[in-house]
Amino acid sequence: MTENKSFKESHPLDDFISDKELSNTTIQKEKLTIEQQKQVDTISKQINPLDNEGLLAFGSDLQKQMSQFSHQMLDEVQSKDVGPIGDTLSDLMSKLKSVNPNELNTDKPSMLKRIFSRAKSSINEIFSRMQSVSAQVDRITIQLQKHQTHLTRDIELLDTLYDKNKQYFDDLSLHIIAAQQKKLQLENEKLPQLQQQAQQSTNQMDIQQVSDMQQFIDRLDKRIYDLQLSRQIALQTAPQIRMIQNVNQALAEKIQSSILTSIPLWKNQMAIALTLMRQRNAVAAQRAVTDTTNDLLTANAEMLKQNAIETATENERGIVDLDTLKRTQRNIIETIEETLIIQQHGREERQLAEKELQQLEQDLKSHLVNIKGPNKQS
């Protein structure tokens, strides 16, 4: 399977996740590029002093996009149930177990009648069952390939969601910096001017302007805090997306291992075991014929006996112990069982992510309601 390049490469948001303190959302201006600083200046100009309605709308579009993004993430987690993948893998394991290597073991002593009359029937029965199981395994392989394709598409979709979340994060960061920049400008320039004007004036409206400016700065500070909360949600969403991606990636790799390694190996080993069984029956039949000829040709009994022993010895050199085949099938079954464990872990992780995303969505809605509430009262 071709690995998704963007999934493997480091994303710029990873630096914020691993190195930065989550509560510290103030970004140093010297780290901004020239283009970013221009964007900050443009955004900062959108904040007009004493325009409370404009302040309430500042960054609200981004927060609405975050709400829509949370819905999309929740829908993604709820709609992607990997239960059918687990059922398919369980079915595959059942089919592989249905043909036991012990059934191909003919080391136990048998009578001449069993060798000649039942050996051929036993081989045909096992061969017929192997063909049936092999056909079923092929159908399961097609299903696994479809599951693998779906998982790969999901990984690519999650990459898109991750990049979109990163863009929200960056846009919110620029809005926060712009608001902080405007706040400093008002505190250090505009407010002192109004205070000085009020001190030199006897007009009560000048004093009211100072109070209005102070209240506006306070609302601006609260607006910055709300944007920081939204930015925090974007920050926490990133590792959750990666967590789901990692589970899907591991499951897709296990499916690929089953398709390209385990299943072909199982078919090859079964074919080899069946060939060895036929060889053993042929050797046993040859030994029986040699013994019968030895009884009839008494004159050459010793010579025939020696030839039979030598022939049997040479033929027996081709016998292979089936312990290796048993270990191989055990490893195949263990691989599939491990895949089922990963699938179960993935289901648990997605359930946990779903609960967390629902809580995050509820928190965001609560903040948006709290923002709109004071405006309506005023």
From Swiss-Prot:
Source domain of life: Bacteria
Q: Which family does it belong to?
A: Belongs to the TelA family.
Give the protein's recorded name: TelA-like protein SAV1406
Species for this entry: Staphylococcus aureus (strain Mu50 / ATCC 700699)
